């Protein structure tokens, strides 16, 4: 299936545009990685992640590393990533990249003329060009294309100008035709990189000594200042990315400390600095047997506020081994649980008489997944 068809299919299956919650502001730095030698050059622009590895860009190339040990290089195209014909036409700068569907989306500029801003698609495994690329309108991307951000849920991609940043450009992800322009609530110049996280566009700015992180609502254009990093004037902020894993979401941001003792680095942030998984204590049903159509009362303690995903599964087997097989039923659903004791009434009208399992998995606001619990429940026939 061609890429454009895959993108269109995903967009149609995604359904309605996701609701946007208030952007997260309490990111706390929990780690820092400094790159030495040639790695400092090769990781000096953008960063992206598929949750399994990290992708880095610099002016002329791309590389892929392990997340937890960036010294382990998994793929290397650091010196010849720009297609030959573009390199011959003075395209000399890869900006902040993004990942989606097994591809890397790389913005490539031809400064200082900025006559042809391209988005070039690469295979994320090999970091080789796929042959698909899209020319953005130079009439609006007047000083190149510093970054590209892919919004899979909405089927679009975003970019902006670097200096005159009162507008957000929204491109059709299947062909990169301009769909619309969103006017920002306030200018946000010198954005070096941006990524979508839970519906908002989070951006890293190279603004003075502050080096701010801001969030942009891509539908309304509302700009929310999240926090300043205050790294000083001799620091150049670069790319930004989100690493989503069961151990929680990390926001990573790259930057360059200039001067005689300069270096390139990546700083790692977590929501509230949280690195501890949530725990459910004594999850159980109030009654082990309920009549179909009544409520099954779920009781559980929670170590912190969580969103718990639950799904029913029907037990199949003989009386001696009633759960010899387990067959999932319905779709996963979510319930909110507060810190401390919780009592949740779950409907059973769709459950046929028999033995059922409930798989309950807590996730906290830092996106850390706790240990799942499997609870048994017998459903009997309703009274006549």
Can you name each region flagged by the protein language model?
Residues 41-48, 87-96, 138-150, 187-196, ...:
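Repeated scaffold domains used in trafficking and secretory/extracellular systems
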Residues 51-52, 101-102, 153-155, 198-200, ...:
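Short coil/turn segments that connect the beta-strands within blades of beta-propeller domains
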Residues 238-275:
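Blade-level signature of beta-propeller repeat domains, shared across WD40, Kelch, NHL, RCC1
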């Amino acid at each position: 299936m061609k890429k454009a068809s895959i993108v269109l299919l995903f967009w149609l299956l995604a359904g309605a545009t996701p609701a946007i919650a208030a952007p997260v502001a309490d990111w706390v730095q929990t780690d820092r990685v400094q790159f030495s030698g040639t790695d400092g050059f090769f990781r000096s622009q953008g960063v992206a992640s598929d949750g399994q590895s990290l992708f880095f860009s610099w002016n002329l190339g791309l590389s892929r590393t392990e997340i937890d040990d960036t010294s382990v290089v998994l793929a290397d195209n650091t010196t010849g990533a720009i297609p030959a014909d573009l390199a011959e036409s003075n395209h000399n700068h890869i900006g902040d990249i993004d990942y989606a569907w097994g591809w890397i989306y790389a913005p490539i500029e031809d400064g200082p003329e900025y006559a042809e801003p391209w988005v070039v698609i690469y295979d994320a495994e090999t970091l080789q060009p796929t042959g698909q690329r899209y020319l953005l309108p130079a009439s609006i991307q007047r000083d190149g294309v510093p970054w590209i951000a892919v919004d899979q849920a909405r089927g679009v991609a975003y970019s902006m100008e670097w200096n005159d940043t009162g507008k957000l450009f929204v491109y059709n992800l299947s062909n990169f035709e301009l769909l619309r322009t969103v006017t920002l609530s306030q200018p946000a110049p010198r954005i070096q990189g941006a990524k979508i996280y839970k519906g908002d566009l989070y951006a890293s700015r190279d603004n003075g000594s502050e080096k701010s992180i801001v969030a942009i609502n891509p539908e309304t254009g509302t700009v929310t200042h999240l926090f300043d990093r205050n790294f000083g004037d001799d620091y150049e902020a670069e790319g930004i990315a989100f690493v989503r894993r069961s151990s929680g979401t990390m926001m990573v941001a790259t930057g360059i400390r200039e001067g005689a003792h300069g270096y390139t680095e990546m700083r790692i942030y977590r929501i509230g600095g949280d690195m501890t998984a949530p725990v459910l204590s004594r999850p159980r049903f109030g009654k082990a047997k309920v009549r179909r159509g009544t409520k099954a009362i779920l009781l559980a303690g929670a170590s912190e506020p969580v969103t718990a995903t639950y799904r029913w599964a029907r037990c199949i087997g003989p009386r001696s081994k009633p759960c010899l097989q387990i067959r999932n039923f319905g779709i996963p659903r979510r319930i909110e649980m507060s810190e401390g004791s919780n009592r949740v009434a779950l409907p059973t009208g769709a459950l046929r008489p028999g033995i059922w399992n409930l798989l309950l998995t807590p996730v906290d606001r830092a996106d850390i997944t706790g240990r799942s619990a499997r609870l048994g429940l017998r459903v009997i026939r309703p009274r006549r």
